[in-house]
Amino acid sequence: MDSSPLVRPVETTDSASWLSMRCELWPDGTCQEHQSEIAEFLSGKVARPAAVLIAVAPDGEALGFAELSIRPYAEECYSGNVAFLEGWYVVPSARRQGVGVALVKAAEHWARGRGCTEFASDTQLTNSASTSAHLAAGFTEVAQVRCFRKPL
């Protein structure tokens, strides 16, 4: 990747790319289920995720996404208004190039704008790549259930 990605709110025109990446991130769900959830989000019918950000290359290629919510609690977070990274994905060809960090920074900006002072996430215990990505983005591991907290 030659330059920084543009990170912006997901749009209807991003549906196919978002669907493809969601199917990769969460293969236990069917692509039809993901497609239905995307349609519900874009129509404003769901509360979670509260926001979806997409990273795109200068040529418009989708590089990753972040799905965000605000929760009343997350592991080791006590503010009562915690931004939560519900889903975070970067396409394999764009990994280790700053795309994931760019998504997290944009998510932090979104969270601060909603009054959040903490940002949390989680991952499976066996997902060492995700753990490394969270740590590289500034999160601190706070529990062995692989929950993360990041002050904003």
From Swiss-Prot:
Domain of life: Bacteria
Reactions mediated catalytically: kanamycin B + acetyl-CoA = N(6')-acetylkanamycin B + CoA + H(+)
Membrane-spanning intervals of the chain: none
Main enzyme class: transferase
Subunit comment: Homodimer.
Record's function text: Catalyzes the transfer of an acetyl group from acetyl-CoA to the 6'-amino group of aminoglycoside molecules conferring resistance to antibiotics containing the purpurosamine ring including amikacin.
Name the UniProt record assigns to this protein: Aminoglycoside N(6')-acetyltransferase type 1
Organism field: Klebsiella aerogenes
GN (gene name): aacA7
